[in-house]
Amino acid sequence: MADRRRTDDNKGAREVVLLLNIGSPDSPEEKDVARYLNSFLTDRRIITLPFLLRQLLVRGIITPFRKKSSAQKYRTVWDESTRSFPLISHTKAIARALAHTGREVHVAMRYGKPAVADVLKELPHGRSLVVLPLFPHYAMSSYETAVEHCKAEIRRLCPNLSFRVVQPFYAHEAYIRVLADNIRPYLTKPFDKLILSYHGIPRDHLDKTTRQALNLRHPEGCCTEEDPTANVCYRYQTYRTTALIREALGLAEEQVEQVFQSRVGHTEWLRPYLIERLSAWPQEETKRILIACPSFVCDCLESLEEVADHGQSIFKKAGGADFTYIPCLNSGANWIDALRNILEE
C-alpha cells in the first residue's frame, strides 16, 4: 500500500508523477563534487553523528580529502555530449518515457539538481501528486531521506497539496519480472555464478531504522524470514529480492551469491563485501561471473566505475577469467511498463 495524505477534496484529479532519485554533482569539477559531498554527507541519515560533529567531520576532513579522488571517479562516467551523469540522464529518460503513457512526470533529486523545492514550485495547481522514489529497498540513507525531505518541502511550500508516496517495490511482481528478463539473456553464456551486488549500508543503520520507525530493536539473526521489521529492514528486502530473482530465473542457490558494495570508512557495514569477494572468487574456482546491481534502477557511478570498471580489474588481477557486467534497467521499455504497474497500485 502507498503512504497517503489527502488534504483537499480534489481526489479525482489525475495525478502528477514526481520521480525521486539520489542525485549527482553538477559536473566532475572538484568544486562541484565538493559541494555535492557536503550536501550528501551532512545529511543526518547518512552520517548519524550530532550536528556540529557531523559538520566538522564532513566539511573539515572528509570532503577536503575526498573531493579530488571522487572528482577523478566522476570524470570516468561524465558524458560531455549531454554534460550530464548517467544517473541524471537515465532518470530524465524514464520521465520522458512515462510521459508518453499520458502522465505528467517531473524529476527531482535528493541532493543536487533539479531540487525538490524548485520542482514543487512548478507543479500545476489543483492536481494531486504521486511521489515515486526510485529506490526498490527501504534504507534510511536512500528511500527514507528522499521521502522525508520531499514531505518537508511539501509542508513548507504547498501544505494543501494532495499526495501519496509509493512504497519500496523490492518484491513487486513487475519489478522482479523485469529484473529477471534483464538478466536472462546473459545466462546463455557459460558462467560459474551470478552475483547480485546491492549498495551497502552501515550495520547500525538497521538498528536505528527499526527503533525510529517501530520502536523496536533490530533482532539478531533476522532478515532471512519476514518479521515485524520487514517493511523497514534493508537487509531483509535485499535478501527477498535475491530469492525472487533466483526463483524467476530457475537457478539453484549455489549459482547465485549476494554481496554488498560501496562501503566507506572503517565501521561495520552489511556483509559480505563485494571488494573482498572479487579477489576470493577466482581462488574458489569461480572464474566466470555475471554481475548485476538490483538496488540501482539506473546506471551510476557505483555501478559503472565501482563495479563494471574497478571491480572487473580486481577480479581479473586475482585470476578471474570472465567478468560480465549486466547493465541496470535504465529506461528500457519493459521497465517503463513495470513502473506503470507499480504506480497504478
UniProtKB/Swiss-Prot annotation:
Keywords from the named record: Cytoplasm, Heme biosynthesis, Iron, Lyase, Metal-binding, Porphyrin biosynthesis
Pathway involvement of the protein, from the record: Porphyrin-containing compound metabolism; protoheme biosynthesis; protoheme from protoporphyrin-IX: step 1/1
Listed GO biological process terms: heme biosynthetic process
Catalyzed chemical reaction(s): heme b + 2 H(+) = protoporphyrin IX + Fe(2+)
GO molecular function: ferrochelatase activity; metal ion binding
EC nos: 4.98.1.1
Enzyme class: lyase
Domain of life the protein comes from: Bacteria
Location in or out of the cell: Cytoplasm
Family annotation (InterPro entries): Ferrochelatase, Ferrochelatase_C, Ferrochelatase_N
GO cellular component: cytoplasm
Residues that coordinate or bind Fe cation: 199, 302
Keyword NAD attributed: no
Listed NCBIfam families: hemH
Family: Belongs to the ferrochelatase family.
Biological role stated in the UniProt entry: Catalyzes the ferrous insertion into protoporphyrin IX.
Name under which the protein is recorded: Ferrochelatase
